[in-house]
A protein has these predicted regions:
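Active-site-proximal alpha-helical scaffold in enzymes
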Residues: 91-123, 176-205, 266-273, 338-339, ...
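Condensing-enzyme catalytic core mediating Claisen C-C bond formation in acyl metabolism
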Residues: 5-29, 150, 235-301, 305, ...
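Flexible glycine-/small-residue-enriched beta->alpha junction loops
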Residues: 116-174
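N-terminal extracellular/periplasmic Venus flytrap/periplasmic-binding protein-like
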Residues: 16, 28, 32-37, 48, ...
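Active-site pocket-lining segment
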Residues: 170-173, 206-209, 217, 287-358
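Conserved catalytic cysteine-centered active-site region
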Residues: 61-116, 146-151, 162-167, 233-259, ...
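Short, well-ordered amphipathic alpha-helical segments that serve as non-catalytic structural scaffolds
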Residues: 31-46, 72-76, 101-104, 168-175, ...
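Conserved beta-ketoacyl condensing-enzyme motif
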Residues: 28-96, 100-117, 121-140, 210-225, ...
Length: 405
């Protein structure tokens, strides 16, 4: 019998574009070009790597109905100048796609099928198209036109009958009611996200992960876009004036929800063999990843069973985590997850540099962002373990635990 050797998967680098606001600085950049920029950014930072050394490129993308169609990972790697011999695949676990792409890369490396993979995700929500279904018969006039920016489209009547069809804000409102999370609690959490991001920007905490984007300007002028543009100056007083978006007496507002954004992320995942062979410095080891399902009407609680599975797999406790990144789809959603684990709303180790409420949530790219932040924050604090978790539309959760190297 062959001796079984445990292969580890390491994060050796993590980059992303700045996140653009809806119809903002990245509105003129296609999703495949955005993803290509992060792939190029990784290789630029590691000039010893020839593109042919990359065994695969795995990207997450939630839309895939516009310019990000037909396997955006393959398109992006070719646009980035990688060898045509490098394969690429695109996966879709909606909001968790980017984190799942990294998990898929780690599993592939741990299985011994690859040594070096680029993984991450991309989303251009600004450029998400309207789509129209085909007529089911000649001269039919009942074709639906759907906005693909976010949420449901072409809903299966059976799905609607069995589970109902709740918008993302409605699912957050459901959690706010179920967990008795007040509007004030949500607004305070949202303000905290903005303030923490502002402080992180002032301290230059994002400079290690951001790849500047050169934007075309008038004539020969160009502009360098190098700072997230979704964060905003606000106050608790200003947040309290915003109207609820689900129902008149509701608590979910634009101010305590994540943004609609554009961006891309990419991480360099390697085996120990690849690290030694290509002189790559491991930053963190990917320990475990877990996914779980919940009822679609409370999709935001998905991280809870996913985190519990990940903790059981790693034989760790939530108290062992030095850094926790909970993707802030909504303040109510993040607070519900924190309540389940008895974590204070203002815990300093949770979303310590802000989250999706302040930075934005370009769906496929967000997993790479929270993972990059966790990696660099672990090193800044000299911590050991970090947990990254996200809720996922239609009722899922994903969680990953990493260890600083």
């Amino acid at each position: 019998l062959k001796k079984i050797i445990m292969i580890e998967a390491y994060i050796c680098d993590a980059v992303r574009t700045p996140f653009g606001k809806y119809d903002g600085s990245l509105s003129q950049v296609r999703a495949d070009d955005l993803a290509a920029l992060t792939i190029q950014g990784l290789l630029t930072r590691h000039p010893q790597l020839e593109s042919i050394y990359i065994n695969d490129v795995i990207l997450g993308c939630a839309n895939q109905s516009g310019e990000d169609n037909r396997n955006v990972a393959r398109m992006a790697l070719l646009l980035a100048g990688l060898s045509e011999q490098v394969p690429g695949t695109t996966i879709n676990r909606l909001c968790g796609s980017g984190l799942d792409a990294v998990a898929m890369a780690a599993r592939t490396i741990k299985s011994g099928e690859a040594d070096l993979i680029i993984a991450g995700g991309v989303e251009s929500m600004t450029r998400a198209p309207y789509v129209m279904g085909k007529a089911h018969k000649s001269f039919a006039r009942n074709m639906e036109i759907e906005d693909t920016t976010m949420g449901w489209r072409f809903i299966n009547p059976r799905m609607k009958a069995i589970y109902g069809v709740h918008t993302m804000p409605e699912t957050a409102e459901n959690l706010a009611e179920r967990y008795s999370i007040s509007r004030q609690e949500q607004d305070k959490f949202a303000l905290q996200s903005q303030l923490r991001t502002s402080l992180a920007q002032e301290n230059g905490f994002f400079k290690d992960e951001i790849i500047p984007v050169i934007l075309p300007g008038k004539a020969s002028d160009t502009m360098i876009f190098s700072k997230d543009e979704h964060p905003r100056q606000t106050s608790l007083e200003a947040l309290t004036t915003l109207r609820p978006i689900v129902k008149k007496e509701g608590t979910i507002t634009a101010g305590n929800s994540s943004g609609i954004n554009d961006g891309a992320s990419a991480l360099l995942i390697a085996s120990k063999i690849a690290c030694d062979k290509y002189q790559l410095k491991p930053l963190a080891k990917i320990l475990v990843t877990a996914t779980a399902g919940v009822h679609p009407e409370i999709m935001g609680i998905g991280p809870v069973p996913a985190v519990k599975k990940a903790l059981a797999m790693s034989k760790a406790k939530i108290e062992d985590m030095d850094i926790i990144e909970i993707n802030e789809a909504f303040a109510a959603q993040a607070l519900a997850v924190m309540k389940e684990f008895n974590i204070r709303w203002d815990a300093p180790h949770v979303n310590c540099n802000g989250g999706a409420i302040s930075l934005g949530h370009p769906l496929g790219a967000s997993g790479g962002r929270i993972l990059a932040n966790a990696v660099y924050q672990l090193h800044r604090q000299q911590g050991k373990l970090a947990l990254c978790t996200m809720c996922i539309g239609v009722g899922q959760g994903i969680a990953m635990i990493i260890e600083r190297v």
